[in-house]
């Protein structure tokens, strides 16, 4: 399921009166987040299987990002942080993205694109040659789903760098590691 975009975060959400968006560098993650495509305002939040999780009228919902979601129940909170970061890198033509599994194994796109796949190995996971080299976005999405299956808030927290509260910028995130844990991405900042 991929809702159709109607506008962007920057277009829909103006800074509060008396505030201005914090300047961001061109081509930065923060700038890319400001231009996230949003679905129409009446779009509900849907689960991976199409079920409505939250009605569009739910007061907790400000907007729905117009991106596809895997048909498997994989993209959770920390995964969404990694997904947006990876999609930003992809949009810039960068292919050096790498995330970590909960067990610590590095999960770089470069290995997946060479035809390797992640498989269980006892209590751990490992890379094995199992496919053909791939380089398109559909293969990249399959790679991300594999990352989502093996990464979590704990592994994301281990890759993160702490930020002082007065230095928070778009692209930073709050994380409560654990099982299940939680992560929330900062999409924009105004001062």
Predicted segments with their positions:
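Acidic/His-rich structured neighborhood in mature extracellular/periplasmic domains
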Residues: 55-169, 175-183, 187-191
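Phenylalanine-focused residue identity feature
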Residues: 13, 19, 29, 140, ...
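N-terminal module-boundary/linker segments of secreted carbohydrate-active enzymes
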Residues: 1-58, 68-76
């Amino acid at each position: 399921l991929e809702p159709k975009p109607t506008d962007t975060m920057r277009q829909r959400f103006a800074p509060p009166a008396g505030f201005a968006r914090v300047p961001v560098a061109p081509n930065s993650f923060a700038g890319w987040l400001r231009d996230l495509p949003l679905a129409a305002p009446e779009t509900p939040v849907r689960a991976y299987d199409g079920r409505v999780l939250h009605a569009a009228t739910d007061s907790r919902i400000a907007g729905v990002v117009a991106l596809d979601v895997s048909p498997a129940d994989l993209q959770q909170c920390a995964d969404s942080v990694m997904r947006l970061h990876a999609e930003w890198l992809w949009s810039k033509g960068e292919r050096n993205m790498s995330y970590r599994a909960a067990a610590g194994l590095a999960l770089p796109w470069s290995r997946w694109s060479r035809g390797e796949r992640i498989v269980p190995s006892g209590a751990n996971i490992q890379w094995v040659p199992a496919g053909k080299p791939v380089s398109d976005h559909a293969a990249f999405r399959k790679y991300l789903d594999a990352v989502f299956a093996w990464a979590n808030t704990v592994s994301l927290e281990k890759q993160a760098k702490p930020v002082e509260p007065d230095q928070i910028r778009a692209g930073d995130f709050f994380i409560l590691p654990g099982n299940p844990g939680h992560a929330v991405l900062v999409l924009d900042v105004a001062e």
